[in-house]
Amino acid sequence: MATTGDDTLTVTASDYIQHHLTNAKMCSADGGIAFNYACQDAGFWTWHIDSLLFSVGLGVLFLWLFYKVGQKATIGVPGKLQCFVEMCVEGVDKIVKDSFHGKNAVIAPLGLTIFVWVFLMNLMDLIPVDFVPEAAKRFLGVPYLKIVPTTDLNVTLGLALSVFALIVFYSIKVKGIGGFTKELTMQPFNHWALIPINFVLETVTLVAKPISLSLRLFGNLYAGELIFILIALMPWWAQFALSVPWAIFHILVIVLQAFIFMMLTIVYLSMAHEDH
């Protein structure tokens, strides 16, 4: 969401957009640790410290919040926060019971963690685009700061690769190495002569899961953030007229993308527990 006015037009629109889409970076240089401008050519070995800070911080907030609510839970009339937590827990538990057909006590807590964590990271997109970055620049001297972790492909890909690792782990644990290998080589065509074709098809299908998971979440949140930034370039009266409706619509995107990421994770892990 945007709050800036005509003063943002003192820089070019492309500069403004580029500035808000650039992460705070840390990298290793010849003289030791370098930050931001010095990391332009660091390549792969660059840490997006803002994405790490906000994603870990929101994860800790989620754990602390649910822990406190669990400690203070009452059997009487619950408060609003307890109602929200109970709704999340019961909703995810029902989804797991309906969608997951194996036996694994980890799936429901994992689904809850993914949903709430991704939801909180997405929710940061509703904070005005200039509010936190401008405060960080003025008071901390930080030139770049992105506060929405899920607009960073590194974060969404990291989440998706974690899910992918669980898919492979449980596929081998439940079916054994032989069963997992057979799944990759004897489907969809159950003939030894077609093993190479089966292997290519099944490998592509398997690898496509984390790629689609990460790109779907990243693409939707990145596009939403970009629209907020474009609205921030407009006059103040246009900002209010456009940002409020877009923010209301974006709430649906925030919740829906968290739900989709959780739901697909549960479905993929359910498939990993099944024999085809």
UniProtKB/Swiss-Prot annotation:
<keyword id="KW-1133">Transmembrane helix</keyword>
<keyword id="KW-0375">Hydrogen ion transport</keyword>
<keyword id="KW-0472">Membrane</keyword>
<feature type="transmembrane region" description="Helical">
    <location>
        <begin position="107"/>
        <end position="127"/>
    </location>
</feature>
<dbReference type="InterPro" id="IPR035908">
    <property type="entry name" value="F0_ATP_A_sf"/>
</dbReference>
<dbReference type="InterPro" id="IPR045082">
    <property type="entry name" value="ATP_syn_F0_a_bact/chloroplast"/>
</dbReference>
<comment type="subunit">
    <text>F-type ATPases have 2 components, CF(1) - the catalytic core - and CF(0) - the membrane proton channel. CF(1) has five subunits: alpha(3), beta(3), gamma(1), delta(1), epsilon(1). CF(0) has three main subunits: a(1), b(2) and c(9-12). The alpha and beta chains form an alternating ring which encloses part of the gamma chain. CF(1) is attached to CF(0) by a central stalk formed by the gamma and epsilon chains, while a peripheral stalk is formed by the delta and b chains.</text>
</comment>
<dbReference type="GO" id="GO:0042777">
    <property type="term" value="P:proton motive force-driven plasma membrane ATP synthesis"/>
</dbReference>
<feature type="transmembrane region" description="Helical">
    <location>
        <begin position="226"/>
        <end position="246"/>
    </location>
</feature>
<dbReference type="Pfam" id="PF00119">
    <property type="entry name" value="ATP-synt_A"/>
</dbReference>
<comment type="similarity">
    <text>Belongs to the ATPase A chain family.</text>
</comment>
<feature type="transmembrane region" description="Helical">
    <location>
        <begin position="188"/>
        <end position="208"/>
    </location>
</feature>
<feature type="transmembrane region" description="Helical">
    <location>
        <begin position="47"/>
        <end position="67"/>
    </location>
</feature>
<feature type="transmembrane region" description="Helical">
    <location>
        <begin position="247"/>
        <end position="267"/>
    </location>
</feature>
<dbReference type="GO" id="GO:0005886">
    <property type="term" value="C:plasma membrane"/>
</dbReference>
<keyword id="KW-0997">Cell inner membrane</keyword>
<keyword id="KW-0138">CF(0)</keyword>
<keyword id="KW-0066">ATP synthesis</keyword>
<dbReference type="GO" id="GO:0046933">
    <property type="term" value="F:proton-transporting ATP synthase activity, rotational mechanism"/>
</dbReference>
<keyword id="KW-1003">Cell membrane</keyword>
<dbReference type="GO" id="GO:0045259">
    <property type="term" value="C:proton-transporting ATP synthase complex"/>
</dbReference>
<dbReference type="InterPro" id="IPR023011">
    <property type="entry name" value="ATP_synth_F0_asu_AS"/>
</dbReference>
<keyword id="KW-0812">Transmembrane</keyword>
<dbReference type="InterPro" id="IPR000568">
    <property type="entry name" value="ATP_synth_F0_asu"/>
</dbReference>
<comment type="function">
    <text>Key component of the proton channel; it plays a direct role in the translocation of protons across the membrane.</text>
</comment>
<protein>
    <recommendedName>
        <fullName>ATP synthase subunit a</fullName>
    </recommendedName>
</protein>
<keyword id="KW-0406">Ion transport</keyword>
<feature type="transmembrane region" description="Helical">
    <location>
        <begin position="152"/>
        <end position="172"/>
    </location>
</feature>
<keyword id="KW-0813">Transport</keyword>
